[in-house]
Every structure is written in C-alpha cells, then in structure tokens.
C-alpha cells in the first residue's frame, strides 16, 4: 500500500480516549489557530462503569457547564459509613448535592462531541505509531495519516516501545496501583436509597482498610471494592466483593434477593495519586489524566483527571511560543502541585487514626465525607 503523503505539521497531537484527553484538545483549540489532532489509542480499554463526579467538574471551564444538563446524573447528598458490625455505623447527609453519579461512557461521549464542535481533528485509528522525535517535532502515523506535531499530550497507555522512545516515566510502583473491582446492577430493585440518596461505603472492609461502595446510578447501581495491588495475593477481589454484599445485607441496605451476579464483575487498575510520584513531563510530551496518574487517593476519576487538562493546555500554549519548548514544558508540574496535588492526597494517610472517630464524632463524619466527595481537608 503506498504511503500517504505527510500532512502539514500539526501543533499538538493528543492521545487517549479519557475525557481528560478530549478536554486538553478542546482547551488547546479554543480561541487559537493551533492545529490540534486528537487520536484514540488502539486497543485502549476503559470499561464503562458508574463514576462519582465532583460538582466542581462543571465549573472547571465555561465549556463544561452545559454538560450538567446533558449528562444523565444521580445526585448524592452524603455518605453512609458502614462497618462489618451493623451496630457501628454513621452518616452525614447534606441539604445540598455533594456529588453526582454518572456513566463514564456517557461523559467520554459528550467530551468527544465537545472536541468535534471546537474543530479538533478527531481520529479513531486502527494503528498508531510514534516513530521518532528530534529538536523540532515528532514523527507519528495516525491511521493513514503521517503527522509531525510539535508536542504530544498522552492521556492513555502506550505500547512499551513508544513509551521508552518518549522517555515516559517507569511503570507505577505497586503501592501506587490499586485494583478497582466492580459489578453493575441493572434497575433499582436492589436497594431503596430514597429520593435524596446518601452513598453507602466501607472504609475498612474485612479489617483490610480496603474501601467499598454502593453507587446509585441513573439506571441502576454499582458495587465496587478497591484494594492495593500488593494485597492481591492475600485478598482476592471476588472475596472482598462478596463480603461487601454480605455487609450490605447485614446492614439491611441490600435485601436477600435477587442474587447479585458476582461472576459478572470487572476489574481495572488505577494509579491512585500517581501524579505525586512522577513529573508528568517527558520528551516533547505532557502526561494528563490516567497516563499522568491524576486519580485522587479516594479513586475519584473525572474531576481530578480533567483538572490536569487545564494545566497542560496552559503550559503548552506558553511553551509553543518559546524558543526552547522542552524547557518551557517543565513548569507544568509546579503549576498543579500546590492545588491539584493537595486534592489528590485524600485522607488515607491518617485513616487509621480517623476511623474510630468517624463512627462516634459527627464533626469528623462530616469532614471525612467532604474530604472524600469534595476534596476538602479533614484537618481545618
């Protein structure tokens, strides 16, 4: 097959299907003359699931505000902290919405529409290759197109060979990677959480300090457990999920019927607060979203990952005007570390000390709820 003639040089090539990647492309293109190309990464796998969305997501940028009406969302008014012992529990319920629950797939689809509406060139190639890079740009093949972008934005996992070529950080450490195991439940017959639901969760499932949730969604629910990857040899995700079902039943949140389809559970590995361990800057490349490890320690996905897009777009716009682009990309990390960096940390570091207080001190129950759902500091 004859090679396609190279396209005119692109300014930025954004890779990855995560909403953060689409948002980066949107912000780079808006009100500029930059040529911005967005490409999904072949074989990138991000299973659809329910995700908790901080209301702050919609105020990150004016272009995101309309999504509040377009997305099918379930409001959450607080958290209900359950334990293995039904007599030990606490709850904080706010008068206002503290979080939303929606479909990851729908958020991604709306962000893709937003990118197309902003004239981002969107590609879904069967093949993607980064061939080489030098002091003026990067040679890449996106489907049938040969591109030479000045800078790359990576928002998803690349093959190892291309990973090394770009000088991307080494694989995440085991203490950063957490296994998130979930099962979707269709319909609302599983539990009645009322018209102003609080979200049931465990902070210490089976005395493992693993977290678990029952997420109320627009058309169903989702059971989920999270554990450090280094604990997989000791605690099987399927066993933790089954134990969580038992805890919910003993706390009379779930009824004895119908049977939960645990055999349909799916798992993904998330680098929680991984951004704190890496620079997020490689050769002519910035990392955003999952590639940069911008999940919060509380497993929050959409808001913190998309927040990274704002800093990346701003850094790239400034760097493209400088004679030495690589040097101009490095302020990226310094920009987000004192704001988004604090948000990513979450309350986990002090959880062993906080846990007894959560069940007997209403002030601490409130603060931990706001820390998990809104990113506020527990210590004030």
Which residue stretches match the model-derived regions?
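Predominantly flavin-linked oxidoreductase catalytic cores and closely associated redox partners
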Residues: 114-251
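C-terminal helical "tail/cap" subdomain of flavin- and related membrane-associated enzymes
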Residues: 317-380
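Conserved Rossmann-like nucleotide-cofactor binding loop
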Residues: 20, 44, 159
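Beta1/beta-strand and adjacent pyrophosphate-binding region of the FAD-binding site
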Residues: 4-20
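FAD/FMN-dependent oxidoreductases across multiple families
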Residues: 231-311, 324
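Short beta-strand to alpha-helix junction loop
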Residues: 93-113, 232-238
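N-terminal FAD cofactor-binding segment of flavoenzymes
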Residues: 42-82
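Glycine-rich FAD pyrophosphate-binding loop
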Residues: 13-17, 26-49
């Amino acid at each position: 097959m004859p090679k396609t003639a190279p396209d005119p040089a692109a300014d930025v090539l954004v890779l990855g299907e995560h909403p953060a990647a689409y948002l980066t492309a949107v912000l780079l293109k808006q009100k500029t003359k930059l040529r911005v190309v967005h490409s999904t990464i072949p074989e990138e796998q991000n299973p659809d699931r329910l995700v908790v969305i901080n209301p702050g997501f919609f105020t990150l940028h004016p272009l995101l505000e309309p999504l509040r009406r377009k997305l099918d969302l379930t409001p959450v008014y607080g958290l209900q902290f359950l334990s293995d012992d039904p007599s030990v529990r606490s709850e904080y319920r706010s008068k206002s919405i503290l979080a939303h629950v929606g479909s990851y797939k729908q958020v991604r689809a709306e962000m893709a529409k937003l990118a197309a509406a902003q004239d981002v060139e969107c590609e879904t190639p069967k093949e993607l290759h980064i061939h080489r890079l030098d002091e003026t740009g990067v040679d890449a093949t996106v489907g049938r197109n040969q591109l030479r972008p000045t800078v790359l934005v990576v928002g998803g996992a690349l093959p190892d060979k291309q990973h090394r070529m770009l000088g991307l950080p080494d694989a995440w450490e085991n203490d950063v990677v957490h296994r998130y195991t979930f099962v979707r439940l269709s319909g609302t017959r599983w539990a009645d959480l009322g018209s102003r639901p609080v979200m049931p969760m465990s902070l210490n499932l089976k005395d493992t300090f693993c977290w678990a949730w029952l997420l109320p969604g627009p058309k169903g629910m989702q059971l989920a457990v999270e554990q450090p990857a280094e604990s997989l040899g000791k605690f099987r995700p399927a066993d933790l999920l089954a134990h969580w079902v038992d805890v919910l039943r003993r706390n009379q949140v779930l009824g004895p019927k119908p049977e939960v389809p645990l055999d349909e559970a799916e798992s993904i590995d998330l680098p929680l607060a991984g951004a704190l361990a890496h620079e997020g800057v490689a050769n002519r490349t910035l990392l955003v979203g999952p590639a940069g490890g911008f999940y919060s320690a509380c497993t929050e996905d959409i808001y913190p990952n998309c927040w990274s897009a704002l800093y990346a777009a701003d850094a790239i716009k400034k760097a493209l005007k400088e004679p030495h682009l690589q040097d101009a990309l490095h302020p990226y990390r310094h920009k987000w570390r004192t704001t988004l960096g604090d948000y990513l940390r979450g309350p986990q570091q002090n959880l062993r000390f906080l846990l007894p207080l959560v069940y007997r001190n209403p002030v601490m129950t409130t603060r931990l709820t706001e820390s998990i759902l809104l990113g506020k500091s527990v210590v004030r």
